[in-house]
Every structure is written in structure tokens, then in C-alpha cells.
């Protein structure tokens, strides 16, 4: 009788990937990146263990918002004080801080009710331009146009 394989945290080999976000829709980019951060692209995926890889997203300022999301999509957060409901419009975020827009989108696609989602989210690195400081890790370029 065979037993189910369960990955152990010490046995996991992590890779580094670079994804170019130029002209890719935000949701499609986020779903592929969230899957890689969770480790669902690996055969040794275990739901309760962080088996994912590190992902670097470059050119976040050049990604695409389809439809009327630039004006209609609103991100809400609260300061925990009375009357402290804040909001940010997706088009303004794309113009002012595109890295935060991508981080919001990917974070909502990861587990949120435990610390595992936070561990996976820490492996995401988003940059608005072409440059990134992770060349020492020798990241491999991941073309996600065939994955979406």
C-alpha cells in the first residue's frame, strides 16, 4: 500500500523566477503568480507546507487593466478609528504605486486565515521598472503568456 507524499520544510528547493508584466492583464498575472508562490506548479505540493518559489515581477507600471477597472475598481481599507474607511481607485494606484496594486491583487489570491499565506506573500518582489536587485540569485525568466 502506498502512502501519500508529504513535503517537509527542510527538503524544499526554491527557485527564483522573473516575470515581465508588460501588457498582461492584472488578474491573469496575479493568478499565475499566486499559484507559483503557493507551489502548486510542483509535484511535491502540500497544502499545509510552504512549497512555493520566489517571484520577481518587473515592469508593473506597464500592466493592463481591462474594461473599466481603472475607474470602477476600488480597494477599501479601514484605519480602525471611527470614520476611518479609506479607498483607493485602481487607476490611481497604477499611476502612483503600481507595485502596491500587484501586491493587493496577489495577496487576495493567497490563503489569508493563517500564517502560511503571509510566508508565501513574503516571497513576492514587485518593481515598477526594469531593474531589480536580485541578480545574485540568478532568477530564470518565466514567460507566462503560454500559462494564461
Swiss-Prot record:
CDD domains xrefs: Ribosomal_L13
UniProt GO molecular function: mRNA binding; structural constituent of ribosome
**InterPro entries named in the record:** Ribosomal_uL13 (IPR005822), Ribosomal_uL13_bac-type (IPR005823), Ribosomal_uL13_CS (IPR023563), Ribosomal_uL13_sf (IPR036899)
Q: Which GO terms describe its biological process?
A: negative regulation of translation; translation
> Among the entry's GO cellular component annotations, what is one?
cytosolic large ribosomal subunit
| Keywords carried by this UniProt record | Ribonucleoprotein, Ribosomal protein
Task: Identify its protein family.
Answer: Belongs to the universal ribosomal protein uL13 family.
Q: How does it assemble?
A: Part of the 50S ribosomal subunit.
Q: What does this protein do?
A: This protein is one of the early assembly proteins of the 50S ribosomal subunit, although it is not seen to bind rRNA by itself. It is important during the early stages of 50S assembly.
Q: Which NCBIfam families match?
A: rplM_bact
This chain belongs to which protein, by name?
Large ribosomal subunit protein uL13
Query: What's the gene?
Result: rplM
Amino acid at each position: 500500500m502506498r502512502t501519500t507524499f508529504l513535503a517537509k520544510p527542510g527538503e524544499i528547493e526554491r527557485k527564483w523566477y522573473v516575470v515581465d508584466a508588460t501588457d498582461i492583464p492584472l488578474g491573469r498575472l496575479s493568478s499565475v503568480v499566486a499559484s507559483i508562490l503557493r507551489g502548486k506548479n510542483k509535484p511535491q505540493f502540500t497544502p499545509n507546507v510552504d512549497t512555493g518559489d520566489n517571484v520577481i515581477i518587473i515592469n508593473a507600471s506597464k500592466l493592463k487593466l481591462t474594461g473599466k477597472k481603472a475607474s470602477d475598481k476600488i480597494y477599501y481599507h479601514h484605519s480602525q478609528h471611527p470614520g476611518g474607511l479609506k479607498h483607493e481607485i485602481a487607476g490611481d494606484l497604477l499611476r502612483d504605486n503600481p507595485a502596491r496594486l500587484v501586491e493587493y491583487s496577489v495577496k487576495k489570491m493567497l490563503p489569508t486565515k493563517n500564517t502560511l499565506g503571509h510566508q508565501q506573500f513574503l516571497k513576492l518582489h514587485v518593481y515598477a521598472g526594469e531593474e531589480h536587485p536580485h541578480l545574485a540569485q540568478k532568477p530564470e525568466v518565466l514567460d507566462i503568456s503560454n500559462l494564461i
